[in-house]
A protein has these predicted regions:
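A short acidic-Thr-Gly-centered motif at the start of a beta-strand
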Residues: 9-17
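Adenine nucleotide-associated cytosolic modules
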Residues: 1-4, 19, 23-37, 41-58, ...
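Non-catalytic regulatory/accessory regions that flank a structured catalytic core
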Residues: 86-90
């Protein structure tokens, strides 16, 4: 592959690129570049490590006519990224030379159902099509998982996979208001399956009554575009983080304690959950069956997890990755703190 930043369409072999990024500002194009992830130019410039795992990542950047992609590719090259290329002439020239593009479109029913979010510039037809093509695995169908599942189903996430081995107990209902009293005693997965079918029968739902652990996490999460950690056990959170890091899948993780909640995204290039919490906290100390929890706080964090998952899939806005959001309902305050990879982390920086 040429070392120059710019590549002509006839010089591009898509199979040779680790990452392809589309920095076009519009989300309403009827076609997409093959294998490309849509990102905003501003987000790519400010957070390149979110999209390029290393300085050696072989990357192609595309836009409409090659100007925006050329500017950002040159800037990334100046910053030390050694194999970043821009498509000369952009997608317009790619199309003019008869190169393949991926058709994007919505059916009349889809356009009507998702009209209000498609109208958002950050979503558009392309973002909605990405949602419809996505596979999201939600681990946990309780107080955090239910609002995630509800909003992703309503938004049109094409394939929802939900993992939870538990049954519904009466004490669950104060933080799981979508479930009727009649569902007490039913499996959470079965109850959620009924709910999703009633809300959006057009998406695919896969429910597994299985407990995720370090031994099965990779096989259960493989194939996901996004994983949502909605569990209430630290052992499961570490297993989700470790497996997703190995698979290269981003994780939206949230947790609640009494009146407080927290939220972040664990990107494949770190920091991971072990960077945030190197020593596993006590399961008993943070068990809501012992400490208690207020229902709306759980719903708030779960809803925010759904928002971040949608942003990841559509490429909208700025990611919360690298920041830990802390919410305190009693004081009605929220703050965010910067988090980074730990040099001693065995997952992000394994010994050589």
């Amino acid at each position: 592959m040429p070392d120059a930043t710019g590549l002509q369409p006839n010089e591009v072999d898509l199979d040779l690129f680790d990452v392809i990024l589309d920095v076009r500002p519009s989300r309403d194009s009827a076609s997409a570049f093959p294998g490309a992830r849509h990102v905003t130019l501003d987000d790519l410039v400010k957070q390149p490590a979110r999209y390029l795992p290393s300085m050696q990542t072989t990357t192609l950047i595309v836009c409409d006519v090659g100007q925006r992609s050329g500017v950002v590719a040159a800037r990334l090259a100046d910053d030390g990224y050694r194999s970043v290329h821009s498509l000369i002439g952009g997608i317009d020239e790619w199309r003019a030379q008869g190169k393949p593009l991926v058709h994007i479109g919505l059916t009349e029913a889809e356009a009507g159902r998702y009209d209000r979010q498609v109208k958002l510039r950050e979503v558009g037809v392309r973002g909605q099509s990405a949602l419809l093509a996505s596979t999201v695995t939600v681990v946990g169908a309780g107080g955090l998982g239910l609002p995630v599942i509800a909003y992703l189903a309503a938004a049109g996430a094409g394939h929802l996979r939900v993992l939870d081995p538990d049954i519904i107990e009466l004490s669950n209902l104060h933080r799981q208001p979508l479930l009727p009293l009649a569902d007490v005693g039913s499996s959470k997965v079965a109850a959620v399956a009924r709910y999703v079918a009633s809300v959006n029968p057009d998406i695919t739902f896969t429910g597994l009554e299985v407990e995720l652990n370090a031994g099965n996490a990779e096989s259960l999460l493989d194939g996901s575009d996004v994983v949502v950690d909605a569990t209430d056990r630290f052992a499961a959170r570490y297993a989700i983080s470790d497996a997703s890091h190995a698979l290269g899948i981003p994780v939206v993780t949230g947790a609640v304690y009494r009146w407080e909640g927290q939220l972040t995204i664990l990107e494949p290039n770190g920091p991971c959950y072990r960077c945030l919490f190197p020593d596993q906290p006590s399961e008993i100390e943070f068990d809501c069956a012992i400490t208690g929890v207020i229902g709306p706080v759980v719903g708030t964090i779960g809803t925010m997890q759904a928002v971040e998952a949608i942003k990841l899939i559509t490429g909208a806005g700025s990611s919360i990755a690298g920041r830990l959001l802390l919410f305190d309902a009693l004081s009605a305050t929220s703050t965010s703190v910067r988090v980074s990879r730990r040099d001693s982390c065995s997952v992000c920086n394994p010994p050589t």
